[in-house]
Amino acid sequence: MAESVAHPSVLNATEEDIKQLLAASCHIGSKNLDVRMENYVWKRRADGVNIINIGKTWEKIVLAARVIATIENPADVCVISARPYGHRAVLKFAAHTGATAIAGRFTPGNFTNYITRTYREPRLIVVTDPRADHQAIKEASYVNIPVIALCDTDSPLAHVDIAIPTNNKGYKSIGLVWWLLAREVLRLRGALSRTAPWDIMVDMYFYRDPEAEREEEAKAVEAEAEAPAVEAAEFEPTAEGAVDPSILAAATAGQVGQSAWDEEGDWNTTGAAQTSDWANTVA
């Protein structure tokens, strides 16, 4: 499925890259097929699911990375994702490459209404899903902003300049494509060597369900509560009103020649101890 492409051999996908794309189900398309996406489909399964050509997926990832790397100011690249599965991916991509991220709802007028506080003038936008991010693509077409999009087999390609064919409905496939794109951009900029592996794990780009995280935290708290408590030191309780001999010994330690505190007798008949006159003492 991974066909040879026209770019230099140094930009070719490695066996590990192809395995990652297959493991993340980037090659699994939908049952529907847009006419413009036919060139990216390898074959159609018996159950009607279209299989995307992984070789062309990698080719478009490299092409998109080369376009992004040509932008002098990284902040002029705007990465957008209205789908929750792409929120974490675009935020991580922006953090690693210096791009501007819009995760969540795209406010209409961001690219066309200069009166709004969120007005931006990017030189390039990258979207996760042309269908979910249609408002951003539509406004970009009004102001001549190039568009790069992650496209499934049923995605509309209107106003999309570079389509990266992939499964844009799974959180693993979305996160992996954004991770590969960020890594390739850093390599083209010279910030990352091609011989050394990237220390950022692909899992950092995957979507995480907040509800699942809360459940894991709750389970951890319950596990700590069920853990056996530390056993207290054993001691023998004394009768009410009695004095523990060990405590009495510690209290009277070093008091040689002094009467016991519980000695019977009339304390009023005993005079106070003689004190020295400190005023007459000469230093």
UniProtKB/Swiss-Prot annotation:
Report quaternary structure and partners.
Component of the small ribosomal subunit. Mature ribosomes consist of a small (40S) and a large (60S) subunit. The 40S subunit contains about 33 different proteins and 1 molecule of RNA (18S). The 60S subunit contains about 49 different proteins and 3 molecules of RNA (25S, 5.8S and 5S). Interacts with rps21.
Q: Which NCBIfam families match?
A: uS2_euk_arch
GO BP of this protein: cytoplasmic translation; ribosomal small subunit assembly
Q: Where is this region: Disordered?
A: 254-283
One Pfam family, short name? Ribosomal_S2
Q: Where in the cell is it found?
A: Cytoplasm
Q: Which InterPro entries match?
A: Ribosomal_uS2 (IPR001865), Ribosomal_uS2_CS (IPR018130), Ribosomal_uS2_euk (IPR027498), Ribosomal_uS2_euk/arc (IPR005707), Ribosomal_uS2_flav_dom_sf (IPR023591)
Q: What is the organism of origin for this protein?
A: Schizosaccharomyces japonicus (strain yFS275 / FY16936)
Q: Describe its function.
A: Required for the assembly and/or stability of the 40S ribosomal subunit. Required for the processing of the 20S rRNA-precursor to mature 18S rRNA in a late step of the maturation of 40S ribosomal subunits.
Q: Which GO cellular component terms, listed alphabetically, does the Swiss-Prot or TrEMBL entry include?
A: cytosolic small ribosomal subunit
Please indicate if the UniProt record lists Nuclease as a keyword: no
Name of this protein: Small ribosomal subunit protein uS2B
Q: Which family does it belong to?
A: Belongs to the universal ribosomal protein uS2 family.
Give the CDD domains listed for this entry. Answer: RPS2
Q: Which domain of life is it from?
A: Eukaryota
Give an example GO molecular function: structural constituent of ribosome
UniProt feature, compositional bias: Polar residues: 267-283
